[in-house]
Amino acid sequence: MASRKDERAAKEERAQAAAELAAKELRDVNQDRERGIKVVEHKEEVSGGPGVIGSILKSVQGTLGQAKEVVVGKAHDTAEVSRENTDYAYDKGREGGDVAAQKAEEAKEKAKMAKDTTMGKAGEYKDYTAQKAEEAKEKAAQKAEETKEKAGEYKNYTAQKAGEAKDTTLGKAGEYKDYAAQKAAEAKDTTAQKAAEAKEKTGEYKDYAAQKAAEAKVLAAQKAAEAKDTTGKDGEYKDYAAQKAAEAKDATMQKTGEYKDYAAQKTAETKDATMEKAKEYKEYAAQKAAEAKDATMQKTGEYKDYSAQKAAETKDATMEKTKEYKDYTAQKAAETKDATMEKAKEAKDTTVQKTGEYKDYAAEKAKEGKDVTVEKAKEGKDTTVGKMTELKDSAADAARKAMDMFLGKKEEVKGKAGETAEAAKEKYEDTEFAARKKMEELKLQEEGVKDEAKQRAEADRETAGDRGSAAKGTIFGAMGSVKDAIVGKLTMPSDVVKDKQQQEAVIKVDETRPGAVAEALKAADQMHGQAFNDVGKMGDEEVIVERKETRQGKM
């Protein structure tokens, strides 16, 4: 738990550091945006020379030079400014592209870290799940083993109880059997005793009858003797004695029969009672044995059912635990998968958002550079047109003044005009040659700038392609925008290029009669004491600057 908190704190610190770095870079970019581009213009002053003619010539030469500067120099300045703006826009675009690539790389690194963290978490959860599953499996096996042991114990206990019940039943049956035998023996002994007693009673009755018969016989003899003594009484006593003897005999026989019947009846009753008791004890013993057997079977069934119930409960508990761990494993796997997908989605959204921000930033910078370039080009164009107009007016005024002076002093300046015209022609040719040379240099410089920009754009495109492949193609748009902005800055808008290419300066002096300028220059030189060789007519005194059109290739 502590390691997870430390890891979370480290992630928060890294995220805060990245946010501070991004805020600092944004602040620097805003400061650079507020600074803008400063353009310094230098003005050159032309010092005048001695003399009116020299001043006029220098004025004319200055006018021609300024006209050349309008055609060549201002275009060069505009090209320099455009190139500086292009370089600035290119540098800013490249910086924006580098920043965007760096941010994309950081976002990629963060996404990779998030992915690694998520995979680590998934591995931990997977290991934890596997560990829990293994523990559940071991626990289930342990439960099964315990259940098996319990079942064995219950089985042994059931067998023991069954054995004990069987032994108890056999013991009870033996006891009941012994009890029945004992009771039968006791009944037999009782019957024998009763029979002996009855026999004894019969003997006693028999002895009693014999005794009574003897007594009666004695009494009869006595009576007979008495009767014999009494003559009259002899017959009566004899009858009486016979009668009494018969009565005693009948009574004895009756008593003997009664005792015999009683003894037989008692013997039969005792025998019946003994048999009935034996039968009852036998049935009781069988009933007890059956009850003991039923109780034993019931106990065995109960223990068997209890063992089966315990085994089923243990199995159900094991299955439930296994199912719970399985559900827990599936839930953890689903949560880990959802967390992984969420982290990947957040990293992807962050990367796309950062790429969009850097793309917008690069596009904004390119647009600002383009606007600055267009504005500078427009200002240069307006300045060039204004300068051309001023120079044209100034040249026309100077030409008019010169013509006026020349017309007033025709004879004085006639000889000097040829030399001055020749010098002006040579100066014009030199200026034209220098202008052409400058145009060629500018053309070569523009081609070099184009080639350099093309190489830079190609290298940046390759770098952007590599970085864009690593960032899943999201940087191509930003680098493409920067590239388009750079190309736009290099090539400039078509209307601006057309205006730049088609700028021309034509200084036209009012036509005069042939020799008028030469005469005026000669007269002026003679007036100031300067001599020169007359070279003749110079033709039409008209200065025309050729228009140079160049084509710029597209990158």
Swiss-Prot record:
<feature type="repeat" description="9">
    <location>
        <begin position="217"/>
        <end position="237"/>
    </location>
</feature>
<feature type="repeat" description="17">
    <location>
        <begin position="377"/>
        <end position="391"/>
    </location>
</feature>
<feature type="repeat" description="4">
    <location>
        <begin position="141"/>
        <end position="154"/>
    </location>
</feature>
<dbReference type="GO" id="GO:0009631">
    <property type="term" value="P:cold acclimation"/>
</dbReference>
<feature type="region of interest" description="Disordered">
    <location>
        <begin position="132"/>
        <end position="151"/>
    </location>
</feature>
<feature type="repeat" description="3">
    <location>
        <begin position="126"/>
        <end position="140"/>
    </location>
</feature>
<feature type="repeat" description="13">
    <location>
        <begin position="304"/>
        <end position="325"/>
    </location>
</feature>
<feature type="region of interest" description="17 X approximate tandem repeats">
    <location>
        <begin position="97"/>
        <end position="391"/>
    </location>
</feature>
<dbReference type="GO" id="GO:0005576">
    <property type="term" value="C:extracellular region"/>
</dbReference>
<feature type="repeat" description="16">
    <location>
        <begin position="359"/>
        <end position="376"/>
    </location>
</feature>
<keyword id="KW-0964">Secreted</keyword>
<dbReference type="Pfam" id="PF02987">
    <property type="entry name" value="LEA_4"/>
</dbReference>
<protein>
    <recommendedName>
        <fullName>Embryonic protein DC-8</fullName>
    </recommendedName>
</protein>
<keyword id="KW-0963">Cytoplasm</keyword>
<feature type="repeat" description="7">
    <location>
        <begin position="192"/>
        <end position="205"/>
    </location>
</feature>
<comment type="similarity">
    <text>Belongs to the LEA type 4 family.</text>
</comment>
<feature type="repeat" description="8">
    <location>
        <begin position="206"/>
        <end position="216"/>
    </location>
</feature>
<feature type="compositionally biased region" description="Basic and acidic residues">
    <location>
        <begin position="444"/>
        <end position="465"/>
    </location>
</feature>
<keyword id="KW-0134">Cell wall</keyword>
<feature type="region of interest" description="Disordered">
    <location>
        <begin position="83"/>
        <end position="118"/>
    </location>
</feature>
<feature type="repeat" description="14">
    <location>
        <begin position="326"/>
        <end position="343"/>
    </location>
</feature>
<dbReference type="InterPro" id="IPR004238">
    <property type="entry name" value="ECP63-like_dom"/>
</dbReference>
<feature type="region of interest" description="Disordered">
    <location>
        <begin position="184"/>
        <end position="204"/>
    </location>
</feature>
<keyword id="KW-0677">Repeat</keyword>
<feature type="repeat" description="2">
    <location>
        <begin position="115"/>
        <end position="125"/>
    </location>
</feature>
<feature type="region of interest" description="Disordered">
    <location>
        <begin position="444"/>
        <end position="472"/>
    </location>
</feature>
<comment type="function">
    <text>May play a role in late embryogeny.</text>
</comment>
<feature type="compositionally biased region" description="Basic and acidic residues">
    <location>
        <begin position="83"/>
        <end position="115"/>
    </location>
</feature>
<feature type="repeat" description="10">
    <location>
        <begin position="238"/>
        <end position="259"/>
    </location>
</feature>
<feature type="repeat" description="15">
    <location>
        <begin position="344"/>
        <end position="358"/>
    </location>
</feature>
<feature type="repeat" description="1">
    <location>
        <begin position="97"/>
        <end position="114"/>
    </location>
</feature>
<feature type="repeat" description="11">
    <location>
        <begin position="260"/>
        <end position="281"/>
    </location>
</feature>
<feature type="repeat" description="5">
    <location>
        <begin position="155"/>
        <end position="176"/>
    </location>
</feature>
<dbReference type="GO" id="GO:0005829">
    <property type="term" value="C:cytosol"/>
</dbReference>
<feature type="repeat" description="6">
    <location>
        <begin position="177"/>
        <end position="191"/>
    </location>
</feature>
<feature type="repeat" description="12">
    <location>
        <begin position="282"/>
        <end position="303"/>
    </location>
</feature>
